[in-house]
C-alpha cells in the first residue's frame, strides 16, 4: 500500500541467468570431480554443457537452452569442482578471468542462448572506442557510494597439497616482498600435482584481493545510453573529483528498476563487497570437498 492509500504490486525476479541457479555441477559416474582444462571460456561452457545441455541424467537436461559457439576467450586454465551451484561456480571463474556470462532469448528459434561476454574497454586510457565516463560532473550518476577495503587483502599464498605435516606438499604463489607482503595459508588438498596445486592456489588467492567498489544510481538517458554506448561487462572510467577517486572499473552488476514514475538503473562498478552469505558459501564448499 502506497502513502496515498493505493495498492502497489512489487514484482522481483532473476533474468534468464537464473536458470543456471537450478543446477549443481555433478561429476560423471566414477569421477570424484568434474575436471576442465582449456581456455577459460571453454571451461565455463563445459560445466554448463555437462549440467544443463547434455547431462548424463536426461532428467537434468533443459531442452530450451543451447550454448553459443566457443571462441576460446580467456587464458589457458584448469578448474575442478563437485556439487557446487553451477551459477555460482561459473561466476567465480568469470570474475577471476575478467569475463562475464549471460543467457539471452533467441525469439526466432525459441531458444535460450548461453554465452560468455568479454566486455569492451571504454576507459579514457584507450583510443579505439569512444570513452564512457560516469561522474557527477557529467550529470549521469547520483546517490554514489565508494568502498576501498584492504581488510582481507593477501598477496602471497602458501598452498598446501596432499600429505600430512612435514610430508605435505607446499607451493608458493605470489611474489611480493618486504612490508607490502601479506601472507596466507591456502588449503589445496584436492590438487593432484604441482601444476594443479599452483593453479588452484592462484584461484583461491584471488579471493583475498583489494576490494574497490563504486555503487551509484545511473541516469539511463544521460550523455551515455545504456545498451547502446555501454552495457554489463564493459570497463569504464568512474570519477569523483571531490573524493579524488578515478577508477577504471568493470560494470559487474546492473539492476533495472521499472516503477510508475519511470525507469531507473543501479550499477556496481568493480569488485562486489563479500557478504556474510558469501562467506558461509565458502565454508559450505569446504565441507562438500
List PLM regions with ranges:
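Active-site nucleophile-His-acid catalytic modules used for acyl/amide transfer and hydrolysis
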Residues: 70-75, 207-222
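Intrinsically disordered, low-complexity terminal/linker regions enriched in Pro/Ser/Gly
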Residues: 29-64, 163, 183-193, 200-209, ...
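Charged- and aromatic-enriched interaction segments used to assemble
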Residues: 8, 14-148
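Short amphipathic beta-strand and strand-loop transition segments with alternating hydrophobic
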Residues: 1-3, 103-105, 252-256
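Short, solvent-exposed secondary-structure boundary/capping segments
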Residues: 1-16, 214, 257-271
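Acidic, small/polar-enriched beta strand-loop surface segments
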Residues: 88, 118-208, 220-249, 255-261, ...
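Envelope-exposed proteins and targeting segments
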Residues: 7-9, 110-112, 155, 247, ...
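Membrane-proximal bilayer-interacting regions
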Residues: 252-255, 267-270, 282-286
Amino acid at each position: 500500500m502506497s502513502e496515498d492509500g493505493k495498492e502497489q504490486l512489487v514484482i522481483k525476479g532473476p533474468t534468464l541467468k537464473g536458470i543456471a541457479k537450478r543446477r549443481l555441477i555433478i561429476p560423471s559416474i566414477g569421477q570424484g570431480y568434474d575436471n576442465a582444462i582449456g581456455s577459460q571460456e571453454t571451461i565455463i561452457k563445459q560445466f554448463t554443457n555437462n549440467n544443463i545441455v547434455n547431462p548424463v541424467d536426461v532428467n537434468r537436461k533443459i531442452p530450451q537452452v543451447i550454448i553459443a559457439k566457443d571462441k576460446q576467450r580467456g587464458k589457458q586454465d584448469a578448474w575442478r569442482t563437485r556439487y557446487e551451484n553451477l551459477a555460482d561456480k561459473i561466476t567465480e571463474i568469470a570474475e577471476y578471468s575478467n569475463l562475464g556470462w549471460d543467457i539471452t532469448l533467441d525469439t526466432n528459434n525459441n531458444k535460450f542462448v548461453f554465452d560468455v561476454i568479454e566486455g569492451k574497454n571504454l576507459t579514457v586510457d584507450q583510443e579505439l572506442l569512444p570513452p564512457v565516463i560516469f561522474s557527477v560532473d557529467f550529470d549521469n550518476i547520483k546517490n554514489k557510494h565508494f568502498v576501498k577495503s584492504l581488510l582481507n587483502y593477501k598477496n602471497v599464498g602458501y598452498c598446501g597439497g596432499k600429505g600430512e605435516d612435514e610430508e605435505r606438499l607446499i607451493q608458493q604463489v605470489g611474489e611480493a616482498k618486504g612490508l607490502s607482503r601479506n601472507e596466507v595459508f591456502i588449503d589445496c588438498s584436492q590438487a593432484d600435482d604441482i601444476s594443479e596445486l599452483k593453479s588452484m592456489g592462484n584461484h583461491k588467492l584471488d579471493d583475498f584481493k583489494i576490494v574497490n567498489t563504486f555503487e551509484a544510481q545511473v541516469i539511463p538517458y544521460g550523455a551515455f545510453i545504456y545498451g547502446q554506448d555501454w552495457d554489463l561487462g564493459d570497463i569504464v572510467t568512474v570519477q569523483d573529483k571531490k573524493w579524488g577517486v578515478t577508477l577504471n572499473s568493470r560494470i559487474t552488476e546492473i539492476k533495472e528498476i521499472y516503477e510508475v514514475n519511470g525507469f531507473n538503473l543501479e550499477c556496481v562498478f568493480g569488485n562486489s563487497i563479500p557478504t556474510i552469505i558469501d562467506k558461509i558459501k565458502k565454508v559450505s564448499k569446504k565441507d562438500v570437498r
